[in-house]
Structure formats: C-alpha cells, structure tokens
C-alpha cells in the first residue's frame, strides 16, 4: 500500500512496477483512472519504460486534489451538533412564557415536544423532547419573581444522503422570571446538556462512530405585555442565547490513506426578536387563551470550524450563519382551579435549516 501522506521527493521517488508486456505493445493499453479516496481525488502518475524485449508501466507518483463533494459531506455531518443546539434553544424559555399566560401560578409542570426539520443535501431530523420542572413564586415590591429547576430528555435522529444516526440527550437547568406590575418581564435560564451520539457515514470510509458531546446554554429574554383590552394583549420581545458546544475528532484510514476530521469547542450566539398576540375567552367555569407569534431568529456568530486532513493537505471549513422566520399558534385552557393544559404548533421558514413542524403539549399543576 502507498502512504499517501508521504509525498514523493526528488530523493525518494516512487518506482513500483505494475505490469509489463511485449515490446511492441501500445503504451495506451494500460491507463490509470482517477479514484476518490478520503476527501481527495487521487490520480496515479504512470510512466513507461521500454527495453529490448518488453515495455513496463510503473507507478512513480500521484496527483491529489480536494474532492468538493466529500468535503461538503464531512461538514454536513459535523453540523448535526449545531442543529441539536438550535432545537434545545427553541425549548429554553417555554416555561416562562407559560407563567405569563396563566397569570403567574407557580407549581409542578411537564412538557412534551415533537418536531421535524430539514436542510439541503437531503438532511432531515426529528426529535422528541421532554421537560419536567418545578418553580416557586416570590412576591416582591412591584414584581413577581419565579425561580425554578428543570430536567430534560431528548431523543433525536438525523439523516442525509451520506449519513444517518441518533442522539440521546439529558440536561438540567435553573431559571428565573421577573414579571413587573407594569407589564414588562425578564427571563433568565442556564442549562447543561450531555449528548450520546451514534452516526454512520458512507463517505470516505468513515463507518460508524459512537461519541459523546456536551453543550451549555445561557439565555435571556425581555419583553413587555401591553393589554389592548382586559382580555387581549400584544407582547414585543427579544431574546439572546449564548452557548458552548464541545468539539470532537475522528481519525481512520481509507484505502491506505490516513484521514482525520475534527472541530474544536465553539460558542454559538443566537438572537431572536418577535411579537406575540393573545386573547382570552371565558365562560362560567372555563377559560381559554389563544395566542399567535411571529419572530425572526438569527446567528450572530459563525458556528465553528471543521478541519479535514488527508493526502491533499488540510482543509478548513468555516461554519455559516443562518437565520429563519418563526411562526406559532397555541391555546392554554383552565381545566380546574389548579390544573392547566396547553397545546402549541410551531414551524419556521426561509432558513438554511428549518423546523418543518413541531407540536408542544404541556400540563401544569399549581400549588
């Protein structure tokens, strides 16, 4: 086998005899073809040598150039972590929004969310996200302060033209929400998530990889709920989430070529602006609040860098920024004095990656 990372030099040339034939044989009868190995297209350099009785074809070198498709495939595989980060971000502040919709009733709560997403290159993913938590209300001068604790579990899977796999994630976080008498509010949350991943790729001989990663999240949201009437409101809002996603590295061989791909820890910074509107409907012993939201979510920092290495050298692929429009509609219902149930539908559009549809159901018991 040829070590493709050991480039031939004038002092150390390859000279591997491949085949020989009678002297009068046409030189074009034996030709070498281009082959994709690793992240490169490799073309052998074949020379002929003629003696009195035969002609010999020998491998004296090779030319390597980057294969753009393999490079894109590697970058797409490593972008799965960012998409998982984004799905966690979209679920960070759900509980605090519920608190405003149920007039600030603290208690125990549970939420389940299921969704699907898609991007170019045949990429699609789906996930089921479960949250449970408990919070407490503190009545202060001019505001109500809620503090709480949450734990989460997410099962997700993703696939594209050249890879597929699944991730199991568990996380825990602390949150606080300050709701001022004026209608203004501030939400804060910090969260840690551990991910166990298993992915199989069909490019560059990568095969199946099991690996663990983790991520941190720190989010803040501020807004103002303005009551148009006693039962109807409009709520402009802005959110900023800063985080950290751990890196990973793979090393292997493809047909004798040493390969590696890695990304370092990186720090996403995601912003969102939007507006929600809502209206409550009530009867003698029931109350339902309908809500609709429209927002714009955007990356403020590029998302990491993927580094590939093979015979053609090192390739650095910088992460791209993305943005999308967010849309949601939902209902919150009072079942009994201390029991609430909510249902919400969401999707996004105009992004490189979009949530095609997501449904979120939550149950709350106040005490």
Language model regions located:
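Extracellular, surface-exposed repeat/solenoid domains
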Residues: 1-62
């Amino acid at each position: 086998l040829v070590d493709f990372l050991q480039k031939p030099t004038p002092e150390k040339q390859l000279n591997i005899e491949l085949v020989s034939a009678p002297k009068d044989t046409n030189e074009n009868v034996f030709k070498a073809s281009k082959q994709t190995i690793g992240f490169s297209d490799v073309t052998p350099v074949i020379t002929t040598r003629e003696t009195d009785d035969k002609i010999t074809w020998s491998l004296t070198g090779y030319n390597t150039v980057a294969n753009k498709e393999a490079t894109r495939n590697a970058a797409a595989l490593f972008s799965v972590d960012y998409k998982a980060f984004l799905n966690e971000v979209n679920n960070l502040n759900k509980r605090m929004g519920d608190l405003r919709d149920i007039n600030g009733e603290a208690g125990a709560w549970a939420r389940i969310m299921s969704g699907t997403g898609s991007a170019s290159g045949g990429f699609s993913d789906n996930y089921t996200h479960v949250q449970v938590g408990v919070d407490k209300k503190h009545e202060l001068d001019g505001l109500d302060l809620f503090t709480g604790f949450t734990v989460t579990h997410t099962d997700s899977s993703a696939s594209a033209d050249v890879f597929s796999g699944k991730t199991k994630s568990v996380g825990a976080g602390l949150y606080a929400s300050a709701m001022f008498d004026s209608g203004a509010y501030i939400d804060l949350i910090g969260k840690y998530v551990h991910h166990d991943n298993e992915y199989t790729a069909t490019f560059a001989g990568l095969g199946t990889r099991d690996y663990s990663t983790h991520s941190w999240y720190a989010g803040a949201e501020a807004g103002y709920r303005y009551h148009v009437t006693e039962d109807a409101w409009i709520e402009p809002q802005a959110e900023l989430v800063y985080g950290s996603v751990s890196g990973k590295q793979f090393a292997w061989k493809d047909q004798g070529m040493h390969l590696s791909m890695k990304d370092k820890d990186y720090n996403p910074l995601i912003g969102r602006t939007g507006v929600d509107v809502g209206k409550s409907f009530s009867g003698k012993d029931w109350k339902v609040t309908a809500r609709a939201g429209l927002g714009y979510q955007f990356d403020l920092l590029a998302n990491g860098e993927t580094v590939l290495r093979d015979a053609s050298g090192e390739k650095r692929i910088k992460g791209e920024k993305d943005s999308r429009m967010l849309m949601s509609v939902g209902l919150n219902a009072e079942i009994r004095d201390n029991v609430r149930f909510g249902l919400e539908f969401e999707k996004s559009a105009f992004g490189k990656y979009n949530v095609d549809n997501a449904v979120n159901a939550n149950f709350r018991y106040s005490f």
